[in-house]
Amino acid sequence: MRALFFGTSEFAVPSLRVAASHTELKGVVTQPDRPAGRGQRLTPSPVKRAAGELGVRVYEPLRMRDFAREIGREPFDLFLLASYGRILPKELLTIPRVGALNVHPSLLPKYRGATPIQAALRNGDRETGVSIMLMDEGLDTGDLVMSRRVAIAAGETYGELHDRLALAGAELLGEALDLTERGDLPRRAQRGEGSVTRPLAKEDFAVDLSWAPHRVVNLVRSLSPKPAARATIEGESVKILAAHVGDDGELVIDELIAPNRGRMSGAQYLRGRGLA
């Protein structure tokens, strides 16, 4: 099967490797290099780096409709997507013979959109999952091919759950590609009431330590290790990396980053400021 893979973030890398082993991968489409780090140097996406290791041609289109015209004459069976970060226009979706399969880290139709992993943790969900869908022009509204439930461990952070879902999604993509090869790819409309997540903004990082302890802990988990929840303790802004609810029901800050002092335990921080 001739395929083109679309992806950008670290989440997509395991799926890219599955695509490379299950299809005749003709190229990888990713977002252009972006400034990163303190020096703001142009940095390739994780998917671009992985594509280089695989020796696969990389495309970095700025205008998707122009890109559709560029590749529209080539015979593709499948487009495969995981965490690409852009919606594909109709001009692209109509190119592949079978369609465009997308790996999404939630049990659709719940948590469509940009931040499904963070939403599941922030809301204190005990399970989430991964879904493979056939894309349409909407935001994660296409027909479902298959999905798999994934339990969320107590205290699990965004970084930990992200990595587990990336692997689970890649495994499920491999199963979907095997079914496609046999001509047995299932599909059904999404059922139930959907919900949509949006990209995170700076105000989403702020935590008020007067909130209920479980609410604070869930927000901290959803943002750890990066970008990290921000809180103000006696006039000083800190990044909270880990917290839990103690036996007495009170909030316990386990780890934080303090200005000019780096990473430390919550107890160390409070002692150092004479607050404990």
How would you describe each model-predicted region?
Residues A20, L78-V196:
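Donor/substrate-binding cores of folate-linked one-carbon enzymes
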Residues T30-R34, R148-A151, I257:
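Short, histidine-centered active-site or binding-site loop motifs used for metal coordination
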